[in-house]
Amino acid sequence: MAHLTARRPQNVEGDLYVDSSCIDCDTCRWMAPNIFGRDDEQSAVFHQPETEAERLAALQAVLACPTASIGTVAPPKDMKEAQASFPIPITDNIYHCGYHSEKSYGAASYLIQRPDGNVLVDSPRFAAPLVKQLEALGGVRYLYLTHQDDVADHQQFHERFGCDRILHADDIGSGTTSVEIQLKGSDPVELAPDLTIVPVPGHTKGHTVLLYDNRILFTGDHLAWSVRLHQLHAFRSVCWYSWPEQIKSMEKLAAYDFEWVLPGHGRRHHADKATMRQHMQKCLDWMKAQ
């Protein structure tokens, strides 16, 4: 939990605050951009919530924060309402799970609700309120893991829901040797007619992305929207395997049609398919110039 004695001086006065344990993962800033900002490489409260919507967004950020670095001076009486709001709908049957894990440096996790079995994309924290909500939405059939960095509490979700975990063999480590479906090679894998897994080595050797319904692309740490650059981009400074390979992977990915980019880290992006193709080309041009 956040500690008032460690409250950052960059916070504005008021009930809500960020303490000095913040790891600058950006979660609160994109979940509640009217409330949180960045100052001196950490988050801070720039504006105290004034409306019910702002209050809910702020408490959702409190729950999602992977390091429990956000607190309130007065114990919140409306936290159960915030807990019940997760997972948060994004579009149609796609949800943001919240409850980010410090084990994955605060990466976002998502849920695809589908008649043939729900898919949990990357692992959130194994938090009781979230688990209860996932049960109410139909449980978890597959736990798809984009890459080795964002596996977090995968074992607990597997034990609770009996879900099959999916991870590329090149990203299997000591904590994931028991993963049920270990992908191999560089060819796309059709898990189901509406689920296509595309290997995209670069950030890690075994990184993959998941395309759902030819509309929603779950990108892990391969691709995200940059607010600073105002375009899609890749993370050159944290490319652990190969930047040239990541460029090749992005070229392959540019051949697919999709409308949403939902990343583990970075900001999400939505555009029509034609515009998204243009944004992908701009991303490639930028990558090749680095």
Report the location of each language-model feature:
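A detector for short, charged/polar N-terminal pre-domain segments
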Residues: M1-V12
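Short cysteine/histidine-rich metal-coordination sites, predominantly Zn2+-binding motifs
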Residues: R38-E50, D78-P87
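Pre-active-site segment of Zn-dependent metallo-hydrolases
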Residues: K103-S104, R114-Y142, G175-V179
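Metallo-beta-lactamase
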Residues: D40-E41, P76-D92, N118-L120, F126-A128, K132-E135, V140-D150, A152-K205, V238-Y241, ...
